[in-house]
């Protein structure tokens, strides 16, 4: 029995030794721990990464057995068997091995738990960082401020930079970078932490709110920035700035400096004129294509007048003001709607300039003529398209709806057939209703909205003339004044005309200039007339002098020619090379002219109330009438008149009554229409010495009337010496008849028949700069013979003209006298027309 137990124990121990080898057990435990770590690492990576990788099954590890290990194992087996022979000692050794195995497992488990705790702490630290959607960098959570209006989060650095850019560009409606929700001002203050930027932000918000208030008026003083909210100040428009140290008075209506005793239009015209004078007198200012392009790229907002720069990058013309949010068109500078570019306004969505008036009129006429054909064509295409298209559309929709469903084929076909049949019945009705409603709407738009909108905006080109009926104007494509910029364009055009004037095209440069004419070699009367053009081109000439020929068109037969030289620098105007000077001053609305010493002409541009230039024509006609002058003055030297040679203009005057009478009638009609504007100031009598002097001159001219010599303007001009200036009133019919009676009796004291003349104050010691800017030109010339006693009828005629450049045309037509023994003496006629087209 004992031997059998020992044998069994030995077999059991051998089995235990094989199964409970400490090295193998330790290796297995280590393998288990490694597998566990790898599994935890894999789980960590899978939790951290958003993309899960496919699990790879690890191949089983193969153990290599060496020859030494086999012999060592045999020796250990023998030793263990010997120890087991001791009975109890063998069992104790087995228990010790189990205890050691347990301690090893606990140590391995403790190391695994410590490593797991470290990994969890690292994962917690990684989870505290968030990626910014703007800069794409990872930051901690405390660098992501919370926004009240939305849930999006961005880092504080990106938000601060974003707010700085928005505020510096005066955008106050700042939205979230990731959505359209607006920031709360409290959030902006917390993010910025900058008092200067917050002051700008609040100021821009205040300005944006005040711009929307129609009663808000900003102080026009420079660097003031004070606003006055005035309620009910239309009747009392004088406002005062309330800022300390300013106190500027300005107008409620025009929002400019207060202008006492002036309307807003008059003050605006005066400001524009002064600005124009300063711009033109400064010789250092030059205009080029670059400067013009730059001016076109900067325009004020039509609502808040904030200047806006548009980049020339081919962008559209739909602009939005960043200050007030006004949506306007860059071409017409008017607030617009979504249908602005579809209306006949002439503004294009992508173009750089609007249509010209010619294109608008052609488009309008084409629309009016082609509208019936186009509408009929559209209706003819729409009706069959709707009748056929609606059933096809309905059938396809029903088929797509039943496709993919568990429905019988018979039921689906029945539904499709029913829907198509119903649509075939309904589609003609729908087509008829659509055409019946759409065609009248299109006709009403074409024949109602289009003409009214074009004529209301001035694009139809139809205007009523001065008693001449309706006139259709076609302008050039390049001469388009876009709305709101007329003043600026006019100023630039005048300034450009100053540098490159051309009399041949009927233009005189600048606001100040002078003309000098030489008449010493006038052999024939010129019948050449320079063409007048409203869009006269400028031509660059050498130096500052301009030469041109100005002649009259009184007769077809040419007997004389007058050459005129315009010199801007000298500012002189003489009508005779030998003697006799005529001084032409400026004439304003109140008909005040200044007599100048010498031969000086100050040629200001006359403007009417709307800022347009004036056209002045002076016709001098010899006819028995009184000397009364309409808004003119003459200053002729006595000595120069006395030294003139005997051959005057009355020396050889052929008959030219047809053309001269025509000019005189037109001038008389113009004079009568303007006679209501003159004002009489005072009356005075002509002294006897002046009458005697004029009588002697007339006798001297009448004695040489049969000679045909080179005429001179100085011979026919009486002396008004000592810087006197006579301001004559218009002719009256009663005085004209009485004058004819006195002339028929051969009376030489016709100067005593003068009724009244107006005294001009301050005719001396006046300078060119003090002359008024609104002027007309008038010349007093007296040419008569003693036998016929003709008088010169001076008629000044003013016409409004929209031309930009001043044009000066001087026409001298001399009617030569013919004597016939079988007929009575005919009255000679002298026609002189000075036309200024500006």
Curated annotation (Swiss-Prot):
RING-type ZnF: 132-179, 301-332
Major localization listed first in the record, in broad terms: membrane
Zinc finger feature spans (IBR-type): 199-264
Binding residue positions for Zn(2+) 1: 132, 135, 155, 158
Binding site for Zn(2+) 6: 329, 332, 340, 347
Record field: catalytic activity: [E2 ubiquitin-conjugating enzyme]-S-ubiquitinyl-L-cysteine + [acceptor protein]-L-lysine = [E2 ubiquitin-conjugating enzyme]-L-cysteine + [acceptor protein]-N(6)-ubiquitinyl-L-lysine
Binding site for Zn(2+) 2: 150, 152, 176, 179
Location(s), subcellular: Membrane; Cytoplasm, Cytoskeleton, Microtubule organizing center, Centrosome
Gene Ontology CC: centrosome; cytoplasm; membrane; ubiquitin ligase complex
Catalytic activity, EC: 2.3.2.31
Annotated keywords: Cytoplasm, Cytoskeleton, Membrane, Metal-binding, Phosphoprotein, Repeat, Transferase, Transmembrane, Transmembrane helix, Ubl conjugation pathway, Zinc, Zinc-finger
Region (Interaction with CASR): 660-838
Polar residues: compositionally biased ranges: 700-717
EC category: transferase
Binding locations of Zn(2+) 4: 251, 254, 259, 264
Region Disordered: start-end pairs: 622-685, 700-721
Ranges of Low complexity composition bias in the record: 631-644
InterPro entries attached to this UniProt entry: E3_UB_ligase_RBR (IPR031127), IBR_dom (IPR002867), TRIAD_supradom (IPR044066), Znf_RING (IPR001841), Znf_RING/FYVE/PHD (IPR013083)
Residues involved in Zn(2+) 5 binding: 301, 304, 321, 324
Membrane-topology annotation of the record: Multi-pass membrane protein
Residue ranges with Basic residues bias: 671-683
Residues carrying Phosphoserine: 631
Protein function: E3 ubiquitin-protein ligase which accepts ubiquitin from E2 ubiquitin-conjugating enzymes UBE2L3 and UBE2L6 in the form of a thioester and then directly transfers the ubiquitin to targeted substrates, such as SNCAIP or CASR.
Domain statement: Members of the RBR family are atypical E3 ligases. They interact with the E2 conjugating enzyme UBE2L3 and function like HECT-type E3 enzymes: they bind E2s via the first RING domain, but require an obligate trans-thiolation step during the ubiquitin transfer, requiring a conserved cysteine residue in the second RING domain.
Protein name (record): E3 ubiquitin-protein ligase RNF19A
The organism of origin for this protein: Sus scrofa
Lineage, opening ranks: Eukaryota, Metazoa, Chordata, Craniata, Vertebrata
């Amino acid at each position: 029995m004992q031997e059998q137990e020992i044998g069994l124990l030995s077999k059991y121990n051998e089995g235990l030794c094989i199964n409970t080898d400490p090295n193998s057990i330790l290796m297995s435990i280590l393998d288990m721990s490694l597998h566990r770590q790898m599994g935890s690492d894999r789980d960590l990576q899978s939790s951290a990464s958003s993309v899960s990788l496919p699990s790879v099954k690890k191949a089983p590890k193969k153990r290599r057995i060496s020859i030494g290990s086999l012999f060592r194992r045999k020796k250990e087996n023998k030793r263990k068997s010997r120890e087991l022979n001791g009975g109890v000692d063998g069992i104790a050794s087995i228990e010790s091995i189990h205890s050691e195995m347990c301690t090893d497992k606990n140590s391995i488990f403790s190391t695994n738990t410590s490593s797991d705790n470290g990994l969890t702490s690292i994962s917690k630290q990684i989870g505290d960082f968030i990626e910014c959607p703007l800069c794409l960098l990872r930051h901690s959570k405390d660098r992501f401020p919370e926004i009240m209006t939305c849930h999006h989060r961005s880092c504080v650095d990106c938000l601060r930079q974003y707010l700085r850019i928005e505020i510096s560009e005066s955008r106050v409606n700042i939205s979230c970078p990731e959505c359209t929700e607006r920031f709360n001002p409290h959030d902006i203050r917390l993010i910025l932490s900058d008092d200067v930027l917050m002051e700008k932000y609040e100021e821009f918000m205040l300005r944006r709110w005040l711009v929307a208030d129609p009663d808000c008026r900003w102080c026009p003083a420079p660097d003031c920035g004070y606003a006055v909210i005035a309620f009910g100040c239309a009747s009392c428009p004088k406002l005062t700035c309330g800022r300390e140290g300013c106190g500027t008075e300005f107008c409620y209506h025009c929002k400019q400096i207060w202008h006492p005793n002036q309307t807003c239009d008059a003050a605006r015209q005066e400001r524009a004129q002064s600005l124009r004078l300063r711009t033109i007198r400064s010789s250092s200012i030059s205009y080029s294509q670059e400067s013009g392009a730059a001016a076109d790229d900067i325009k004020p907002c039509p609502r808040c007048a904030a200047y806006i720069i548009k980049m020339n990058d081919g962008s559209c013309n739909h602009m939005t003001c960043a200050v007030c949010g006004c949506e306007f068109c860059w071409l017409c500078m008017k607030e617009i709607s979504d249908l602005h570019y579809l209306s006949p306004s002439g503004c294009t969505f992508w173009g750089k300039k609007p249509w010209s008036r010619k294109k608008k009129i052609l488009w309008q006429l084409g629309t009016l003529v082609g509208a019936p054909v186009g509408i009929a064509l559209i209706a003819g295409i729409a009706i069959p398209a709707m009748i056929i298209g609606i059933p096809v559309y309905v059938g396809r929709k029903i088929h797509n709806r039943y496709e993919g469903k568990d429905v019988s084929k018979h039921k689906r076909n029945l539904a499709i057939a029913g829907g198509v049949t119903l649509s075939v019945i309904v589609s003609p009705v729908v087509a008829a209703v659509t055409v019946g409603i759409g065609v009248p709407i299109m006709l009403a738009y074409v024949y109602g909205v289009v003409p009214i909108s074009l004529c209301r905006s001035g694009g139809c080109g139809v205007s009523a003339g001065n008693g001449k009926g309706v006139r259709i104007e076609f302008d050039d494509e390049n001469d388009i004044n876009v709305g709101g910029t007329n003043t600026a364009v006019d100023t630039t055009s005048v300034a450009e005309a100053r540098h490159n004037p051309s009399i041949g095209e009927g233009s005189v440069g600048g606001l100040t200039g002078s003309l000098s004419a030489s008449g010493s070699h006038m052999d024939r009367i010129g019948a050449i007339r320079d063409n007048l053009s409203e869009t006269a081109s400028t031509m660059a000439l050498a130096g500052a002098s301009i030469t041109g020929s100005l002649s009259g068109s009184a007769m077809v037969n040419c007997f004389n020619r007058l050459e005129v030289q315009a010199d801007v620098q000298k500012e002189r105007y003489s009508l005779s090379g030998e003697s006799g000077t005529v001084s032409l001053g400026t004439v304003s609305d109140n008909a005040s002219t200044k007599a100048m010493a010498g031969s000086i002409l100050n040629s200001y541009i006359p403007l009417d109330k709307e800022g347009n230039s004036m056209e002045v024509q002076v016709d001098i006609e010899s006819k028995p009438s009184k000397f009364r002058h309409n808004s003119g003055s003459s200053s002729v030297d006595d000595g120069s008149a006395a030294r003139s040679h005997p051959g005057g203009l009355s020396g050889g005057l052929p008959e030219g009554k047809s053309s001269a009478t025509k000019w005189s009638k037109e001038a008389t009609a113009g004079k009568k229409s303007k006679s209501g504007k003159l004002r009489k100031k005072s009356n005075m009598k002509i002294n006897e010495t002046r009458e005697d002097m004029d009588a002697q001159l007339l006798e001297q001219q009448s004695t040489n009337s049969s000679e045909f010599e080179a005429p001179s303007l100085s011979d026919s001009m009486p002396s008004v010496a000592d810087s006197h200036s006579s301001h004559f009133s218009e002719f009256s019919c009663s005085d004209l008849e009485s004058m004819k009676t006195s002339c028929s009796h051969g009376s030489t004291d016709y100067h005593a028949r003068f009724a009244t003349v107006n005294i001009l104050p301050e005719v001396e010691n006046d300078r060119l700069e003090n002359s008024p800017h609104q002027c007309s030109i008038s010349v007093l010339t007296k040419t008569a013979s003693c036998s016929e006693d003709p008088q010169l009828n001076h008629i000044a005629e003013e016409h409004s003209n929209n031309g930009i450049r001043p044009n000066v045309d001087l026409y001298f037509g001399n009617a030569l006298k013919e004597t016939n023994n079988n007929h009575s003496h005919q009255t000679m006629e002298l026609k002189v027309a000075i036309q200024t087209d500006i």
